[in-house]
Amino acid sequence: AVHQPGMTLLVPPIFWYEVANALWVAVRRQRIPSGIAEEALGVLLDFLFEEWDLDATDCLRTALRQDVCAYDAAYLQVAVDTGSALWTTDRRLAMAGEQLGIETEPHKPA
């Protein structure tokens, strides 16, 4: 799928903490300076992301049923709740999505 102007990307509330953690790891491993990490977060905040409120019980059930961690289940649950495609390059997550009838972009499980 191609990003289209004005498209809103739905994310679970954990998304921003995962982004911040990935940037922290990059700084800690001296891959990027802290100023770049802060700038990168600022750039992402300018995108049209919408947090989708999730039910923790639904996430746990999805995690147990699909044998994925609760963090990954949150992304699956957003797609299930909204009928949206799941954008991931994680093969295992894409396969779990396919089992739930979720369209996955850009990775399509074989």
Where are these regions (language model features)?
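Short alpha-helical "patches" and their helix-cap loops
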Residues: A1, I32-V43, R91-E98
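Short, well-structured N-terminal submotif of metal-dependent ribonuclease cores
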Residues: A1-I14, A26-G35, L100
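Conserved beta-strand segments of alpha/beta enzyme cores
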Residues: T8, E50, E103-E105
